[in-house]
Amino acid sequence: MGTVTPMMQQYLDIKEQYKDCILFFRLGDFYEMFFSDAELASRELEITLTGRDCGLEERAPMCGVPFHAADNYIARLVSKGYKVAICEQVEDPALAKGIVKRDVVKVVTPGTVTDITMLDERKNNYLMSVYKNGNFYGLASVDITTGDFYATRITWGNTRGKLLDEIAKYLPSEIIVNNELNSDNELTSEIKQRFNTYVSTFEETSFEYGNSMDILANHFEKQTLNIQEYDIAVNASGALLKYLESTQKVNLSHIQKFNSYALEEYMILDASSRRNLELTETMREKSKKGSLLWVLDKTMTSMGGRLLRKWIEQPLINHGDISLRLDAVEELKNKFMVRVEARELLKRVYDIERLMGKVVLGSVNCRDLIALKNSMCQIPYIKSLLNGFEAEYIKNCGEQLDCLEDVCNLIEVSIIDEPPVTIKEGGIIKDGYNPEVDKLRMASIQGKDWIAALEASQREKTGIKNLKVGFNRVFGYYIEVTKSYFSLVPEEYIRKQTLSNCERYITPELKEIEDTILGAEEKIIQLEYSLFVEIKEKIAEQLSRIKSTARALAEIDVLASLAEVADREGYCKPEVSLSDKIEIIEGRHPVVEKMTDKSGFVPNDTVLDMEEDRLAIITGPNMAGKSTYMRQTALIVLMAQIGSFVPAATAKIGLVDRIFTRVGASDDLASGQSTFMVEMSEVANILINATKRSLLVLDEIGRGTSTFDGLSIAWAVIEYIVNKEQLGCRTLFATHYHELTELEGKLPGIKNYCITVKEKGEDVIFLRKIIRGGADGSYGIQVAKLAGVPQSVIDRAKEILSNLDDADINRSGKARRIKKQVDGQLDLFAQAAKASADAEILEEIRKIDISRLTPIDSMNILYELQRKMNNRE
């Protein structure tokens, strides 16, 4: 067995340190992969798998990609959940003694992508760290491209459920966990399946409290005292920073603030409610179009787009903060011309947050700096527009805007207006910025002028009419003469290269000027790069000022976007208060009215409080608009609490601390849960975690099981909710159990509502208007007909329904008036049970073959039927 070559041994030594990564190993102009990495990469990237002699008996499997095109291949691997370690040559091959030194300069993972072209510009790319200690969890999240860093802890209640809810809020691309969480196979599997995210363990020592505090204290310095208050969030935060340091291997100074928060500081939205309300994407297509974000996002900048998404995902519960936003939106809505001008200026602002991330992380180029300069040029005009505003929020934003003239001027005088992408080939520094660069450029230019003059003089001197002076990287400058003029070549010409149709020569004089030109150009390239690094570092020193300004621009952008939507769509300013009353007049669903003919959308009122209008029971057929109505109420409340105007004539919103929705049902095949089990799990979560200030939106509770079981559960849930000692919160409750409408007047705080329907022959027209009272029928067969069910099935359904009518089962399903009470509660089931027993006895009578009965048989059957009737009563 052979011994591997020195180069391959170097590869294996580095690969040993990065076992969980695909190693991109730089060899000349290519990144090469070997052995199992090569086999994996060739399959995933669909590139050719070859081999390379490595000193062993068999050739090493190998594949590679050009270094200049590597970003695209790295992006494809990372998008599939792989980590990629970038191994570069860290010394000049010309100066190397033996094997060129190589080392990993960066590890690219799903959560640490810094290449903006690989990311959604309007969405944060979060890396999350989760630390588990018993039933407690510490969380930390960071977007490395912007420097946003957040941390919290989960130490009470259903901590597992709250953890999943926080993950649903951030939707991280990658999660690192400690060993205790990793050993919880059920939880880690659920996280991977539900959120389609990359989960891996990280060194346990980095999760230890002492080590984490040291890491955080070293990075955040003066903020350490505040950090200590968040105990197990410290463990997660320290590990997160350590992971970034170990993968990025660069300065992380753009992560400037430790933003700690408690879950209760914002409206709580569980994962199910976020999904059901389609806040940022639709349930089916996972598309932005059709979501609330799609309606509200008229932002002009990427920064504003990301901030608006965050506002929607994290509504406020502080009345004062909400009022500040609403007042700002109102003034921007009213000042139409100023808003238009401000938005036009914002359109010219690039993604300052991510550009500054590139500055600090070392991936910025000159075109990025020009984009930064052009963005800063808009700030004085935007600041001037804000001077006349009265809204406190806007005035604060104006004060935060720093015109950054010094930074803008630095880039203006130093970087050419249209620079190349690369920063290592010169041609990026303006004339007049640096005397040495100017001097070297003059030498280079003069040398090239001399070359041009030489060509003319040599033609005249030799008589070679097509003589020319050329250049290539291998031979440098040369004099080229074609075959037809070989006889005229002077003796002092030194032959350098022979080609099929010509020969190339040099002269001592040409070689001397070549040294001058090339020496100057090489020095220019080195000097320009050094100057670029110096300029970049000067800009990085102003990071705090620039980030603060970028944040203010993003806030103005979001407020202006909300004002624009309010103006275009005819939204009203909601009156948000600390009361318990929700009163929406002529409310509309913000998305549905946008997706359909606006003039055809039927507005509806909503009244909820914690007294007489605690719980609204809503009945009506499928497709009539119950779900739309309930969702629109939840969305209007949420919109009000992010500081947005709302689609209604008027709206009074008593603050809501959390919104829970139970809408629709489907089997959770991944966890082996049936539709009914999923439904009951969601109901349990709601009843356990809801408070008196919560808003519940419940649709078809109990429909996943038998009629009597479902009715029993729905009834019990209503009892629990309306009971002030147990819950007593504001609730919309849609149901097909018409028997539940009898609860109005029997239990406190319940009101019946229904969707109006117009019958036209055997057809129905859904009027989509909510009115007081219970529905007259479910219209199931008519809905089936509208859905396109074959006519033969419709006809058979009518026949069966008619037979059931004969069996004395009320066709409409409408509850009969109940006089009897059992233990102080309504006997809602007695009548339904009686009807079911009657139907069974009638069916037995139908099956009797009278022609074959003896008198004794007849008497026995009659006796048995009588016994059943007596037992029924």
Swiss-Prot record:
Pfam families: MutS_I, MutS_II, MutS_III, MutS_IV, MutS_V. Keywords: ATP-binding, DNA damage, DNA repair, DNA-binding, Nucleotide-binding. ATP binds at G620, P621, N622, M623, A624, G625, K626, S627. One of its GO terms (biological process) is mismatch repair. GO terms for cellular component: cytosol. Coiled coil: none annotated. PROSITE patterns: DNA_MISMATCH_REPAIR_2. SMART domains: MUTSac, MUTSd. One of its GO terms (molecular function) is mismatched DNA binding. Belongs to the DNA mismatch repair MutS family. This protein is involved in the repair of mismatches in DNA. It is possible that it carries out the mismatch recognition step. This protein has a weak ATPase activity. This is DNA mismatch repair protein MutS.
